């Protein structure tokens, strides 16, 4: 059967093959916005997430333009957009809409396994590319990270355990994302942030906490662990008061 991640990667291989048949990258350069600069103070990366394999439909018919505008008005330092269609019901159209609406750093949240996906994300308006260590060989991770740099973009290199963390540290990446969700089981454990954060603090690397962040208590916990930001999707997509969530993020520790 394989894990959920295995299934997603298999689907991405099909999508990449289709991209090579249907898409020709444009060789134009454009201005980009820096997440690293945004993370000089504690930052919320607010996500547009219609659905997920673990939760099903979350906010399927969201008005992306309105949601992103609200995020920016409330003080988001960056916006993340799911572009995977099969498992998360996102699209590159959502990414494009977010770019049209916003002038803050924009993350293409997908399962990137090939350079052509980075080309497409760049052309659609992304400033940041997510590279998931669990989805890539060490060689492929290094190759894709180099390509991100070549394009003038930034990367969040995502890890879930100690082994993946050591692989990520070798790249000395812009930002490391500790995913509290195990992509093989989709279970969430916020203690991963505390556990792996210690090592990243020792290395003096810039890092954020991703997944499972729903409350003021969660924000306090990851701030105490040393996170310079949080990536939040579900909590914001289902919130009746997005501004209240952002107020909670201002908690002092």
UniProtKB/Swiss-Prot annotation:
PROSITE patterns: IGPS (PS00614)
Gene: trpC
Single GO term (MF): phosphoribosylanthranilate isomerase activity
Statement: the UniProt record of this protein carries the keyword Kinase: no
InterPro entries: Aldolase_TIM, Indole-3-glycerol_P_synth, Indole-3-glycerol_P_synth_dom, Indole-3-GlycerolPSynthase_CS, RibuloseP-bd_barrel
One matching Pfam family: IGPS
Recorded catalytic activity of this chain's protein: 1-(2-carboxyphenylamino)-1-deoxy-D-ribulose 5-phosphate + H(+) = (1S,2R)-1-C-(indol-3-yl)glycerol 3-phosphate + CO2 + H2O
Pathway(s) this gene product operates in, as recorded in its UniProt entry: Amino-acid biosynthesis; L-tryptophan biosynthesis; L-tryptophan from chorismate: step 4/5
Record-given protein name: Indole-3-glycerol phosphate synthase
Superkingdom, taxonomy of origin: Bacteria
Keyword annotations of the record: Amino-acid biosynthesis, Aromatic amino acid biosynthesis, Decarboxylase, Lyase, Tryptophan biosynthesis
Entry EC number(s): 4.1.1.48
GO BP field: L-tryptophan biosynthetic process
Family: Belongs to the TrpC family.
């Amino acid at each position: 059967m394989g894990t959920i991640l295995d299934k997603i990667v298999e689907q991405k291989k099909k999508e990449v093959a289709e991209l090579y048949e249907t898409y020709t990258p444009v060789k134009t350069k454009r201005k980009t916005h820096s997440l690293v600069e945004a993370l000089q103070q504690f930052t919320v990366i607010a996500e547009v997430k219609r659905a997920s394999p673990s939760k099903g439909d979350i906010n399927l018919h969201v008005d992306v333009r309105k949601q992103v505008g609200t995020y920016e008005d409330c003080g988001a330092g960056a916006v993340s957009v799911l572009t995977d269609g099969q498992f998360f019901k996102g699209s590159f159209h959502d990414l494009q809409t977010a770019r049209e609406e916003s002038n803050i750093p924009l993350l293409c949240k997908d399962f990137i396994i090939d350079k052509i996906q980075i080309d497409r994300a760049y052309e659609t308006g992304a400033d940041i590319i997510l590279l998931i260590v669990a989805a890539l060989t060490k060689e492929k991770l290094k190759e894709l990270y180099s390509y991100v740099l070549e394009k003038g973009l930034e990367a969040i290199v995502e890890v879930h355990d100690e082994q993946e963390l050591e692989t990520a540290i070798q790249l000395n990446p812009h930002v490391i994302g500790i995913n509290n969700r195990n992509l093989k089981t989709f279970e969430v454990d916020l203690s991963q942030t505390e556990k792996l954060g210690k090592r990243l603090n020792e290395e003096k690397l810039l890092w954020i906490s991703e997944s499972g962040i729903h409350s003021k208590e969660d924000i306090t916990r990851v701030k105490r662990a040393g996170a310079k930001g949080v990536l939040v999707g579900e909590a914001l997509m289902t919130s009746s008061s997005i501004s209240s969530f952002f107020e909670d993020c201002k908690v002092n520790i």
